[in-house]
Amino acid sequence: SSRGSACFEQLNGLIDIVGYLRWLALSTWVESVDYVDELWLFASNEADRQRFLLHAWDPDDSFETCHRQGRDAIGNATTKQFLYCAEGTIDRVLVRSSDMMMRYLKELNYVLREGLTDGLHAIVIEQERQIKHLMNDETALGLTELRKLKPSINSADDASVEMINSLRYYETLAEERRMTLLRNPYVYAAWGDDEWSSVPLDENC
């Protein structure tokens, strides 16, 4: 069990720990069950070579049920409300260190409150525009995975409607999940320093 900021300082010397906490927060937001092996760490001999930086890579398997009904997930009933399907070795620090847990909750608030920006919404709109612009019948018929899910697709119009509806569905799902997390008393308490309350942590994890 770590006290104070020592744990953060040690980890941050090895890895961009704030970036990792934000990646973990995003994975919790979209209920990803495959975030551990979808993370790319990189370093450079030219700059800051002893410290790894992060780059998200193919964050798939979102809005899925945790493996084995969450039996392998780290944390207790309280922390699992805002730490979804956490199974990474480094994640164990969060449920042993109150300082690290507070830092995680603050980054979760950052991602939830500032991450879904107008700019990201504009990206969704642009994706819709590109789908409509680039899709043709030949391309639509080549979308084998999509047509397997919905065999009735046999034209560009059919494929465009299905893809755009999917975009809108996940956009709505993400917003609903965001509001659920923001209503959590521990997440909300971490947003305002004056309202902070301790999160029950696991002594052995």
List the predicted regions and their residue ranges.
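Middle-to-C-terminal accessory/interaction subdomains
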Residues: S1-L39, A43-C205
